[in-house]
Amino acid sequence: MTAIRNVAVGLVPAIALAACSFEAADPTPVSRPTAPGELLVRVETVGGLLPPLDAQRSVPAISIYGDGLVLVPATVPDIFPGPAGQELEAFHVGAGVLDEIVAAAGVAGLHGPERRVEQEGPEFVADGGATVITVVSNGQRHVTVADGLFDVEPGTPLRRALADFVRRLVELRNTATDVVSYEPSAVAVFVAAFDEAFVPDPQMVTRVEWPFADPLATWGEPVPPDGLSVDVRCRVVDGDELDLLRDALRTLTTTTVVVQDSEERILAWRPLLPDEANC
């Protein structure tokens, strides 16, 4: 698990609200999304060496929308096996805070063209993940990718500015007073081949009947390969189907194997975010 994933679940020490405020704002006027479901800012981790389906079940460290809705990962118990899916928590921030975030993004250089900030210095981490910061402003989507941003101490002024921006975003959770569990209207369900090599104790494996009507072997559509993971397939589950099986999905763990006839797969799921429609 990379450092930004740890930050996302609240492992960064809490700091005073004043320290979390977005100061030194860029005075240049910038338009931003204001409607529900319109993404304003997102921070997520991609890449890195992870067990099968860990990348698929992960959710962004934070997603902030134009109406002030903020979604963050719910805390996952530090036990093995862990849940097969990742839950979310929700809270809201006011329009003034959103404006400050947009201005602070400008100070950090996040309103410009897409760019990649590579690692520098002797502490290079070959298999670290990359932090992806997406900011939507002036009707455009601006993406900054910083390799290994939280795997080593940020050394350059730019990397320090990016790390500080991310930390202040994540700290919004520590000052929120209206945090609730988020019930998604749709989830992405992933399946992949089962490999006992990824289970430290085969006795921890539990097998359950495949709960869906669609055949397990041809579930959904193939997920584009990333060169590291096993072959993965995914389909969106929503509506009555999700209402029927939501509780069943929450009982599955990372060592649950779903079975249909001679087919066996591991399963992972994650909530679809308000700006997402597909896996």
Question: What name fits each language-model region?
Answer:
Residues 73-113:
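A short-motif feature that recognizes glycine-rich, charge-decorated loops
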Residues 54-75:
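Short, flexible N-terminal segments of the mature chain
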Residues 60-62, 89-91, 140-145:
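Short beta-strand segments
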Residues 1-9:
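Bacterial N-terminal signal peptides that target proteins for export
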Residues 16-19:
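C-terminal motif of bacterial Sec signal peptides marking the signal peptidase cleavage site
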Residues 56-58, 85, 127:
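Residues that act as N-cap/strand-start positions at coil-to-secondary-structure junctions
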Residues 21-50, 54, 111-279:
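Short, well-ordered, aromatic-rich surface patches in folded extracellular/luminal domains
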Residues 66-67, 94-98, 135-141:
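A short, structured loop/turn motif at beta-sheet edges
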